Swiss-Prot record:
GO biological process, one term: translation
GO molecular function terms attached to this record: structural constituent of ribosome
The organism of origin for this protein: Maricaulis maris (strain MCS10)
Keyword list, A-Z: Ribonucleoprotein, Ribosomal protein
Highest taxon of the lineage: Bacteria
Protein's recorded name: Large ribosomal subunit protein bL33
């Protein structure tokens, strides 16, 4: 069986609230760290979420 190309990643809020999203990305085509602007319900606004490894 072939090795999967998608890996699970954790998107941590930059607002410091501790809120995170879990998503997946193709590690072969997207080699740089992912930064997305998403909604943080704890801060109640849209903030940047940066990629981190799932522990």
């Amino acid at each position: 069986m072939a090795k999967p190309t998608t890996i699970k990643i954790r998107l941590n809020s930059t607002a410091g609230t501790g809120y995170f999203y879990v998503t997946k990305k193709n590690a072969r085509t997207m080699t740089e760290k992912l930064v997305l602007k998403k909604y943080d319900p704890v801060a109640r606004k849209h903030v940047d979420f940066k990629e981190a490894k799932i522990k």
